[in-house]
């Protein structure tokens, strides 16, 4: 007996609805065993941003926590006791004592090497007594000097320069804007009228003497073209549009987002509207960068405060760099979101997106989605069972991923605050324990973590996987400076690292490199690949004479790889597409698949139309008579 089609549809919908509940829980809490709440190590206080760096210079990664109504924390993992403990203790003789900064209301935190000494400085953004505009207490920029951490912004030379940020801000991030291996601190300030533009603090090389500990700072935001006034919220940095130089994406509140494209000289131009990511009527929060469909282009995922969340896939239709929102209805469901993280938690090759929500006017569970690549189609997005990381009543304010215990599986740390003091939460991942993994740590020419570098792992079966070494993302946070690759049952055959200045290294891999951590130093000279080494690049790629995996251009083959009814061959990253020979009239162009004609970028009143409206003040309008279509 056959089942009626409508019943099949109903059954399919019910199965899909229950998938996230039936699947194995992604996260289990280990807070009680790894970071037991107590006054010294995990105090019940208001916390916000979290960052990961090597604080003590010992080679392992520590976790920095921005304390708002309590001290900042520095959590180090004790391999013997299997616990995280705070090394920034209340003892003035401790080299980490200054990092506590008990007087500051810290909200954002980031770390990077600003002076080229090979060790990362630590920046805490404070928002004392201010939601926007001027604050009553300045930010702190800590450098390890004279055997302890000291605040550079308090040095006489910088006090005279009046460089300290005294404006209420939100996120901070690190950007090597010129590709020189020294970083600037990008500060997403929350402006009040014409008070509090975004800032960009970096070392003034001409006035500094790093060998003697003299670091003169200046604000280069105006010269770089990023001194914008807005309600700054989230920031993410990496080669989004550029090949290797870092671009900057900011999702903002009460104003359009920014996508600052690097002009190649360390200055930036905002192209958010042209690229379709300005989202002017929403209020951004957490943001992350990732290559979800493994096409070599960097995509943007972010959450809007009680608005639709976005998953912007980068396209290159007709040689124009644009983004399209592929978020499903469930993925986009509005929530009081804070942090957004993109990572392969279960090491199955596919990326997950974690939404950290704050219990705002009632419970609001955290959520996690898997974004799975599909050939010649947008990725499949499915909600997973978030498990004990749901935290229905958690006042989530920040979160990071890092492998603090060295088992090759990412750990999740969540902070809480806002209006209810809660301790930190720590979660381990349940599924994927048998999956293969690879972790890559590139270094700058000075030996520091190469934040903003692009790392590509080529595999035997699943093509290339791309990661950006994080310089700030999530929301108020900064992830570990590691390219973490989950490989499932696959094997990585080659890894390439691209530094912001365009330098690159290709390293062939063997099976013995799997389940390990690779440190990749900055290339002083070109390192040739031995002729005896045969590199497998996977389907759609081939090794060139320099041992680099490059895309095969199937469209140059003879006879043609495309059939007669779809004769136009379009080479894609690791593959190709065949489409009809569509011809379009003036003002129109073929869509990405060549199946229809769409309007070219339209102009109304002398300015480009936004990605979310066809006419100013008119939304979701179809102008059928003109043959124009709006991509909503």
Q: What are the functions of these language-model segments?
A:
Residues 20-40, 46, 185, 208, ...:
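Gly/Ser/Thr/Pro-enriched helix-cap/hinge segments flanking short amphipathic alpha-helices
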Residues 57-67, 116-126, 179-188, 242-251, ...:
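Acidic/hydrophobic-patterned starts of short beta strands in beta-sheet-rich repeat architectures
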Residues 19-29, 71-89, 133-153, 195-220, ...:
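Beta-propeller blade repeat segments, especially FG-GAP/WD-type strand-to-loop junctions
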Residues 132-133, 146-260, 266-272, 279-289:
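Solenoidal tandem-repeat scaffolds enriched in leucines and small polar residues
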Residues 4-20, 619-630:
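Cleavable N-terminal signal peptides of Sec/SRP-targeted secreted and luminal proteins
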Residues 601-620:
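C-terminal GPI-anchoring signal of eukaryotic secretory precursors
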Residues 32-50, 68, 92-110, 156-174, ...:
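Repeat-based blade/solenoid architectures
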Residues 535-561, 580-604:
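N-terminal entry motif of extracellular EGF-like repeats
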């Amino acid at each position: 007996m056959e089942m009626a089609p409508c019943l099949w549809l109903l059954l399919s919908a019910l199965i899909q609805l229950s998938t996230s509940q039936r699947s194995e829980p992604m996260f289990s809490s280990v807070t009680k065993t790894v970071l037991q709440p107590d006054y010294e190590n995990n105090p019940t206080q208001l916390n916000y941003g979290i960052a990961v760096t090597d604080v003590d210079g010992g080679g392992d990664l520590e976790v920095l926590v921005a304390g708002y109504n309590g001290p900042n924390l520095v959590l180090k993992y004790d391999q013997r006791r299997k616990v995280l403990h705070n090394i920034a203790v209340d003892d003035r003789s401790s080299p980490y004592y200054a990092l506590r900064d008990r007087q500051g209301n810290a909200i954002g935190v980031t770390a990077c090497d600003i002076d080229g000494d090979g060790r990362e400085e630590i920046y805490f953004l404070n928002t004392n007594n201010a939601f926007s505009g001027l604050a009553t207490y300045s930010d702190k920029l800590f450098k390890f000097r004279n055997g302890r951490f000291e605040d550079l912004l308090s040095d006489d030379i910088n006090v005279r320069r009046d460089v300290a940020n005294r404006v209420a801000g939100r996120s901070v991030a690190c950007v090597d804007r010129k590709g020189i291996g020294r970083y600037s601190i990008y500060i997403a300030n929350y402006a009040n009228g014409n008070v509090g533009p975004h800032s960009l603090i970096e070392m003034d090389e001409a006035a500094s003497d790093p060998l003697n500990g003299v670091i003169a700072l200046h604000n280069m935001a105006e010269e770089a073209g990023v001194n914008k006034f807005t309600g700054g919220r989230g920031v993410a940095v990496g080669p989004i549009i550029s090949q290797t130089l870092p671009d900057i994406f900011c999702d903002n509140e009460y104003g359009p987002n920014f996508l600052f494209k690097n002009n190649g000289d360390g200055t930036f131009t905002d192209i958010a509207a042209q690229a379709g990511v300005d989202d002017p009527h929403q209020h951004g929060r957490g943001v992350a960068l990732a290559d979800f469909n493994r096409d070599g282009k960097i995509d943007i995922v972010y959450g809007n405060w009680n608005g639709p969340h976005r998953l912007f896939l980068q396209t290159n239709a007709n040689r124009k760099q644009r983004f399209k929102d592929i978020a499903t209805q469930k993925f986009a469901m509005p929530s009081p979101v804070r942090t957004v993280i993109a990572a392969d938690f279960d090491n199955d090759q596919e990326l997950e997106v974690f939404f950290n929500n704050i219990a705002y006017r009632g419970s609001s569970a955290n959520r996690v989605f898997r974004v799975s690549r599909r050939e010649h189609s947008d990725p499949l997005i499915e909600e997973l069972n978030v498990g004990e990381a749901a935290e229905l009543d958690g006042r989530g304010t920040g979160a990071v991923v890092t492998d603090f215990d060295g088992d090759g599986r990412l750990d999740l740390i969540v902070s809480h605050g806002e209006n209810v003091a809660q301790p930190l939460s720590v979660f381990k991942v349940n599924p994927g324990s048998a999956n293969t993994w690879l972790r890559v740590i590139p270094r700058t020419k000075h030996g520091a973590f190469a934040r903003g570098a692009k790392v590509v792992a080529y595999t035997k079966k699943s093509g290339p996987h791309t990661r950006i070494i994080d310089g700030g993302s999530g929301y108020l946070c900064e992830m570990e400076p590691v390219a973490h690759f989950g490989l499932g049952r696959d094997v990585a055959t080659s890894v390439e690292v691209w530094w912001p200045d365009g330098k690159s290294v290709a390293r062939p891999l063997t099976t013995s490199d799997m389940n390990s951590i690779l440190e990749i130093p900055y290339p002083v000279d070109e390192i040739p690949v031995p002729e005896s080494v045969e590199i497998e690049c996977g389907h759609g790629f081939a090794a060139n004479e320099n041992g680099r995996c490059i895309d095969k251009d199937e469209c140059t083959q003879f006879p043609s790889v495309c059939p007669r009814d779809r004769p136009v061959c379009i080479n894609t990253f690791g593959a190709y597409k065949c489409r009809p020979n569509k011809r379009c009239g003036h003002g129109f162009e073929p869509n990405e698949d060549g199946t229809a004609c769409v309007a070219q970028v339209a102009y109304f009143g002398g300015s480009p139309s936004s990605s979310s409206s066809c006419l100013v003040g008119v939304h979701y309008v179809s102008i059928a008579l003109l043959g124009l279509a709006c991509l909503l």
